[in-house]
A protein has these predicted regions:
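Conserved, mostly hydrophobic/aromatic
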Residues: 68, 101, 161, 212, ...
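C-terminal beta-strand-rich structural cap/linker in extracellular carbohydrate-active enzymes
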Residues: 473-487
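Carbohydrate-binding surface patches
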Residues: 393, 398, 404-466, 477
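Active-site neighborhood of glycoside hydrolase catalytic domains
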Residues: 190-211, 218-318
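Loop/turn elements at helix/coil->beta-strand transitions in domains of secreted/extracellular proteins
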Residues: 64-65, 98-105, 156-160, 205-211, ...
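N-terminal signal peptide c-region/cleavage motif recognized by signal peptidases
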Residues: 11-13
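Aromatic/acidic polysaccharide-binding cleft in carbohydrate-active enzymes
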Residues: 307-393, 402-407, 413
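N-terminal catalytic cores of secreted or lumenal carbohydrate-active enzymes
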Residues: 31-209, 240
Length: 487
């Protein structure tokens, strides 16, 4: 409420606070660089400025991490690097202290469209079936995904892992094809057992699967691989097969539904409306190739007992550009996604080569640039790398999103009365003219604010926190992460 913001802003003054400033400038002169100059909070208020009011009393979701998908293609490139070069780039990306601290991994359960070829963990001769899963094997992933994931866990043992299938094994599908075709009803039970075997097999390799989504993009049958799945059938699968099998096996792996675009908030809600299915489901996952991010908030407000996850978005740039157009994706994918209740942000491909390979034919993504481009042992850091770094480095898992004034939001202006010194008056601002931002309180007691200046002019970022004020300037098209001690 406005009263709560006022009380927080007028709290008892404390010692001087210094703001650290990490910036990426559109002209590439600074790429997620800690600025040498610091700014201190003081009691000097700009009467004409609109302030971002920060109020840690009002807190929202707990963040679980920011990261990427370790696709089969990503792992294929990483495993081909020399061990020293691979260790160096993995340390840079995943070390929470000395690197940028990517803090969430999405794996593909079987192949995705960013593999050199398609496969499942139970591929058998055409025309045959394997209801006992005697041929189940992680053999393909053991060549690249598993060893790379093990190396990442050696750097950060606490990184959460979510896995998503693009398709069931071909012999389980009505079409008999890896592209499109629904899961056969008589294969629901064996497919649930297939999920269990995967989670258990990865656990034996030292990789704990924290969550699975039931199907990547269940409304897309044009990808290779892909498998369409409507909510009514997923309800049946969850409540009669997958949920009971996970329970029977004693797995603590979360079950996440939907895993597709923001244009269909009804999908997850349909599953939640069946209590026998909903009891097995932790939350729903979203992409943003269609629809509005507010769909996530809509689902959360309908079912606040269920979590929201953001699991995929391709974020690319042309190689060799003089500019880095970072403001828009940070505004949308870090600020927008977290303000709409997502507990994480996972962007798409971690790594590709200069040709954006590998990918499958007939639907595989030919323009899915990685967060990094790998050419032998040479590494190029791309747009998506810096988008996630602005959050992952400074907003560790366990951080809580807290209130900060959004553009166009109602706010409060606090200033000293002109005729009565040391007396304060407040004004209600109906539509605050502030840059896009989101703010977190970390477990270490830091306030972290991420700001995007998605405009062609310089913005003055005015911050009001705990009775003090600070002013920072942000260049056009630039992004900053500001950090200071909470009080």
């Amino acid at each position: 409420s406005l009263i709560a913001a006022l009380i927080s802003a007028m709290a008892v003054p404390a010692a001087a606070q210094t703001i650290s400033d990490w910036e990426t400038k559109a002209d590439r002169s600074e790429l997620f660089a800690l600025q040498p100059e610091t700014v201190e909070f003081d009691y000097k208020r700009n009467e004409r400025a609109a302030y971002i009011v920060v109020d840690p009393v009002r807190s929202y979701q707990t963040m679980e991490g920011f990261g990427f998908a370790l696709t089969g293609g990503s792992a294929e490139h990483l495993i081909k690097m020399t061990p020293s070069a691979r260790h160096e780039i993995l340390q840079e990306m995943f070390n929470p202290k000395d690197g940028v601290g990517f803090s969430y991994i999405r794996l593909t359960l079987g192949s995705s469209d960013l593999n050199s070829f398609t496969f499942s963990y139970d591929d058998i001769e055409e025309g045959k079936e394997d209801f006992k899963l005697k041929h189940f094997s992680l053999s393909q992933d053991l060549k690249d995904v598993v060893p790379v994931m093990q190396e990442i866990l050696g750097i950060n043992p606490d990184i959460p892992v979510m896995s998503s299938p693009w398709s069931a094994p071909v012999w389980m599908k009505e079409s008999g094809n890896i592209r499109g075709g629904k899961l056969r009803k008589d294969c629901y039970q064996v497919y649930a057992e297939y999920f269990v075997k995967y989670v258990q097999a990865m656990e034996k390799e030292g990789i704990h699967i924290d969550a699975v989504t039931i199907q990547n993009e269940p409304l897309n049958s044009r990808n290779t691989p892909s498998m369409p799945w409507d909510p009514a059938d997923q309800i049946e699968f969850v409540k009669n097969n997958l949920g009971p099998e996970f329970e029977k096996a004693g797995l603590d792996t979360d079950i996440i539904v939907f895993d597709h675009n923001c244009d269909r908030p009804d999908y997850a809600l349909a599953i939640y409306n069946d209590p026998d299915a909903a009891r097995y489901v932790t939350g729903s996952a979203y992409h943003h190739y269609r629809g509005d991010l507010s769909a996530m908030k809509y689902v959360y407000e309908a079912r606040p007992d269920k979590k929201i996850y953001f699991t995929e978005q391709m974020t690319t740039e042309r190689p060799g550009m003089d500019r880095i157009d970072i403001a828009a994706p940070v505004k949308r994918l870090i600020i927008g996604v977290t303000r709409n209740w997502s507990s994480n942000v996972i962007l798409w491909n971690l790594a590709a080569d200069p040709l954006n390979d590998p990918h499958t034919d007939n639907g595989g993504c030919s323009m899915c640039q990685g967060a990094i481009t790998i050419d032998g042992d040479k590494v190029t850091r791309n747009l998506a790398y810096y988008v996630i770094a602005h959050a992952s480095k400074l907003v560790p898992p366990g951080s809580k999103r807290i209130f900060s004034t959004a553009p166009g939001e109602r706010s409060i202006s606090i200033c000293e009365d002109e005729q009565h010194p040391q007396m304060w008056r407040t004004n209600v601002i109906e539509k605050a003219d502030v840059p896009d931002n989101v703010t977190f309180l970390t477990p270490q007691g830091k306030i972290v604010m991420i700001v995007s200046n998605d405009s062609w002019s310089r913005r003055e970022v005015n911050i009001q926190y705990n009775g003090k004020f600070a002013r920072v300037r942000l260049a056009p098209g630039s992004v900053a992460t500001y950090v200071w001690d909470a009080e």
